[in-house]
């Protein structure tokens, strides 16, 4: 039966047509049971017989492709098409009506080319790449490029990245047509639609009006403007009847007349509530395993839940009569032939599961094929070309300035070396002239840290270095309590030490027997004073002079193995005025503030201030040199008298014991010059008054017998003190002894933490050599070997501890890394087959077990 466009009779049975939608099945009131993509909307008369235009409705179940002409009840899709459009963009583009409605919306917004380009790319990709379609594919690619990509003012061109457009242009120009050449552009346009146009479409008036007129309305008769502007529109579903009432067409029409009509295109809260659930994600809408009971559309809904997407089901899924029956437990549900009263709720959950699976299939698919590696887009330039160019130019200019500065510094150093070599040739000639220091490379030939250390940080590094102050204090208190402390107050000023070294090198012509030693000292170190050699000869009188000199050379060269030029550097008075100039070690040995090269620099600096300045006469230098050499001669005489007198084997043993217990002046880290780094512990400055005041005569030479007696007394006191010291002080003393006996290389980096005991203790060979050198005068130290594995390390740490009974507290003092540890020590035990166990010791007063004359432990960190 066809739909009548004229007025219907008032008979209730005559107004019911066969193509009208049926009421929902009990238990599925919240679901819409229509999926027809081309619905038909039926208009009912108001009882006056006025003609109205009929419109298509989405709620009709009639389908022309079925055998019966309509879908059997219960077999319809769970949701209508216009509700599936809100699930994803692909659901919208898979439906013809959705495409048409979406295109209409895009035309209103002025961006319909986005949808056309998307479909053009999809059609181009579906063309098979065969020889017959090659020309067709080329023409289609050119057409798509010219219409959408080439036009820079078009919406597609503006939404496509420059790299993508250049890639498509290259493919078209080179005629390298590939099915995936537009895939990247299609992906970008699709992202634009999903982020901008598609959400706007779901909130637009055209979509809301479509869903309102095409679905069940909460009102019985909704006001709708027809084509002629007359008549009332009504949704396709039959009106809901209250209990104990009959439906009357006139009654509903009268009720509609009393209501305020709403404009069809107006976006109201009621329309948003009706479409809230379809627009919400399916994962939020449904909760598997939970029974949902939908409330009435008349119930107020909190806007917070509506806006967040957690709204209830659409208002069209509830009926007042059904809701009342559910609340009163009355068996008055509307039943059909295929429905069962009291349907169990598990069918609702099953339907929800089916909808979730369908949503996964729709939203989880990948519409675009995989892009091969050869066709991928080039990486996007993340920095703007102008900014990149500015930054590159700035860096290149900085590199250029650095190189120019290095070249200028190189030229200045070359000029300084040439001038110094020229003035060195004008030095006074004599027997000492043949012992001139060899030429050494300049500062810039070494790593920058040594250069900076030598040039800028050497002057006041000693005063500011706490390690040097601590070493001086410990050495004064614990090693030499009776001697004068080599503190900062006993160091000579800058104008003394280097100047006297230079004078010493230039005025030793009258004493030939001192020339080899003095020349050797100057050639090797350039900074050591002659008293070092005197002290060394005094304690080695039983050995030949050649052997002594060879040993001195070996010790000094080993301590300065990396080069003598980095041991010290004098800053001339004109340093700030002659920036960039640097003195070499040769100049340092022969010059200070009163030597020839320094005089030349001072003359350069003061030439602008006083042009008539005169160089000091050399007579004063000669007098000073004479006094120094006289002091050296007196010291040598004392040595010769001591050698002739002799003191027997006991005296020799005392000397050797004193030598082994008190390290040489070369090895002992004493006070260093203010402009020498604190790491140069080898350079010892004598504290004689004649260095501070050149006019004062030197001190008389010390008596060797007195020195030997003093050395023996100190050795005895040291042994007594060592036995009474606690373990921590003995550890500090052992570390200090190790630091004195082992010569550290110059300019070595200062340790920020105390190293491990095993790295600082003496090895067995060194201990044996010391005992042998001592001649057996000192009693052997009763000590025990302590070895421990620290935190699972494969190599143990080994050290010597005085005494046979070692407690856990003493053992903890050996560990330099403090923390929470557990301590296990190896001992003999018959408890297990292996015969040994690692026993845990926790008390600090507990004595550690001894295994094979050793204490073997394991230190494990507590997690």
UniProtKB/Swiss-Prot annotation:
Q: Which intervals carry biased composition (Basic and acidic residues)?
A: 543-554
List where in the cell it is found. Answer: Cytoplasm; Nucleus; Cell membrane; Membrane
Q: Which InterPro entries match?
A: Axin-like, Axin_b-cat-bd, Axin_TNKS-bd, DIX, DIX_dom_sf, RGS, RGS_sf, RGS_subdom1/3
| Biological function | Component of the beta-catenin destruction complex required for regulating CTNNB1 levels through phosphorylation and ubiquitination, and modulating Wnt-signaling. Controls dorsoventral patterning via two opposing effects; down-regulates CTNNB1 to inhibit the Wnt signaling pathway and ventralize embryos, but also dorsalizes embryos by activating a Wnt-independent JNK signaling pathway. In Wnt signaling, probably facilitates the phosphorylation of CTNNB1 and APC by GSK3B. Likely to function as a tumor suppressor. Facilitates the phosphorylation of TP53 by HIPK2 upon ultraviolet irradiation.
State where composition is biased (Basic residues). Answer: 529-542
Record-given protein name: Axin-1
Query: Which residue ranges does the record annotate as region Interaction with PPP2CA?
Result: 572-790
Please describe the post-translational modifications of this protein.
Phosphorylation and dephosphorylation of AXIN1 regulates assembly and function of the beta-catenin complex. Phosphorylated by CK1 and GSK3B. Dephosphorylated by PPP1CA and PPP2CA. Phosphorylation by CK1 enhances binding of GSK3B to AXIN1. Also phosphorylated by CDK2 which regulates interaction with CTNBB1.
């Amino acid at each position: 039966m066809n739909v009548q466009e004229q007025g219907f009779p008032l008979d209730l049975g005559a107004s019911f047509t066969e193509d009208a939608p049926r009421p929902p099945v009990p238990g599925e009131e919240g679901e819409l049971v229509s999926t027809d993509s081309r619905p038909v909307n039926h208009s009912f008369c108001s009882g006056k017989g006025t003609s109205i235009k009929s419109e298509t409705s989405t709620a009709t179940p009639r389908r022309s492709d079925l055998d019966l002409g309509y879908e059997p009840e219960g077999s319809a899709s769970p949701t209508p098409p216009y509700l599936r459009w809100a699930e994803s963009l692909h659901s919208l583009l898979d439906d013809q009506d959705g495409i048409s409605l979406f295109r209409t919306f895009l035309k209103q917004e002025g961006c319909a080319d986005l949808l056309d380009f998307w479909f053009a790319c999809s059609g181009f990709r579906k063309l098979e790449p065969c020889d017959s379609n090659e020309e067709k594919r080329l023409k289609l690619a050119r057409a798509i490029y010219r219409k959408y990509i080439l036009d820079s003012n078009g919406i597609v061109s503006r939404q496509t990245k420059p790299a993508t457009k250049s890639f498509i242009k290259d493919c078209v120009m080179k005629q390298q047509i590939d099915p995936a050449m537009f895939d990247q552009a299609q992906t970008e346009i699709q992202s634009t639609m999903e982020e901008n146009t598609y959400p706007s479409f779901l909130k637009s008036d055209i979509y809301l009006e479509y869903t309102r007129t095409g679905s069940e309305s909460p009102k019985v008769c909704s006001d709708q403007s027809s084509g002629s502007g007359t008549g009332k529109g009504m949704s396709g579903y039959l009106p809901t009847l209250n209990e104990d009432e009959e439906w009357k067409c006139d009654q509903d029409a009268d009720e509609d007349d009393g209501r305020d009509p709403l404009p069809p295109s107006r976006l109201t809260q009621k329309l948003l509530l009706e479409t809230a659930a379809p627009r919400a994600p399916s994962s939020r809408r449904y909760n598997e395993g939970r029974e949902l009971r939908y409330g009435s559309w008349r119930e107020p809904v909190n806007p917070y839940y509506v806006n967040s997407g957690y709204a209830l089901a659409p208002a069209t899924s509830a009926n007042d009569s059904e809701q009342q029956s559910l609340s009163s437990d009355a068996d008055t549900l509307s039943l059909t032939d295929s429905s069962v009263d009291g349907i169990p709720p598990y069918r609702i959950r099953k339907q929800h599961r089916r909808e979730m699976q369908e949503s996964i299939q729709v939203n989880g698919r990948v519409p675009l094929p995989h892009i091969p590696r050869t066709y991928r887009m080039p990486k996007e330039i993340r920095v703007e070309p102008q900014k990149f160019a500015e930054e590159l130019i700035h860096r290149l200019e900085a590199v250029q300035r650095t190189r120019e500065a290095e070249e200028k510094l190189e030229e200045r150093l070359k000029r300084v070396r040439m001038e110094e070599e020229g003035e060195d040739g004008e030095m006074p000639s004599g027997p000492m002239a043949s012992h001139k220091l060899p030429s050494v490379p300049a500062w810039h030939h070494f790593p920058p840290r040594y250069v900076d250390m030598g040039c800028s940080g050497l002057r006041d590094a000693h005063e500011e270095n706490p390690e040097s102050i601590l070493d001086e204090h410990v050495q004064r208190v614990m090693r030499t309590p009776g001697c004068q402390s080599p503190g900062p107050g006993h160091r000579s000023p800058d104008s003394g030490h280097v100047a006297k070294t230079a004078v010493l090198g230039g005025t030793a012509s009258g004493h030939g027997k001192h020339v080899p030693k003095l020349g050797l000292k100057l050639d090797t170190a350039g900074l050591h004073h002659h008293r070092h050699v005197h002290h060394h000869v005094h304690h080695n009188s039983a050995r030949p002079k050649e052997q002594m000199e060879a040993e001195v050379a070996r010790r000094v060269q080993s301590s300065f193995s990396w080069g003598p030029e980095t041991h010290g550097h004098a800053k001339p008075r004109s340093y700030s005025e002659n920036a960039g100039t640097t003195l070499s070690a040769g100049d340092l040995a022969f010059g200070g503030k009163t030597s020839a090269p320094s005089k030349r620099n001072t003359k350069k600096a003061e030439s602008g201030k006083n042009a008539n300045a005169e160089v000091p006469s050399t007579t004063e230098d000669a007098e000073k040199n004479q006094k120094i050499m006289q002091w050296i001669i007196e010291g040598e005489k004392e040595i010769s008298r001591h050698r002739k007198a002799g003191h027997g084997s006991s005296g020799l043993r005392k000397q050797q014991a004193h030598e082994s217990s008190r390290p040489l002046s070369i090895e002992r880290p004493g006070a260093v010059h203010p402009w020498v780094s604190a790491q140069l512990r080898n350079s010892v400055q004598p504290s004689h008054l004649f260095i501070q005041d050149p006019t004062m005569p030197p001190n008389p030479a010390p008596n060797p017998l007195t020195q030997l007696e003093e050395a023996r007394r100190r050795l005895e006191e040291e042994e007594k003190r060592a036995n009474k010291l606690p373990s921590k002080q003995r550890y500090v003393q052992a570390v200090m002894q190790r630091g004195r006996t082992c010569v550290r290389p110059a300019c070595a980096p200062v340790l920020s933490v105390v190293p491990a005991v095993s790295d600082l203790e003496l090895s067995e060979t060194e201990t044996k050599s010391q005992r042998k050198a001592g001649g057996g005068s000192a009693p052997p130290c009763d000590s025990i070997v302590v070895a421990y594995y620290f935190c699972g390390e494969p190599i143990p740490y080994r050290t010597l501890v005085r005494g046979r009974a070692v407690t856990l507290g003493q053992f903890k003092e050996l560990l330099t890394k403090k923390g929470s540890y557990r301590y296990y020590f190896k001992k003999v035990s018959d408890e297990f087959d292996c015969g040994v166990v690692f026993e845990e010791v926790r008390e600090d007063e507990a004595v550690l077990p001894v295994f094979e004359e050793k204490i073997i432990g394991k230190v494990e960190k507590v997690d």
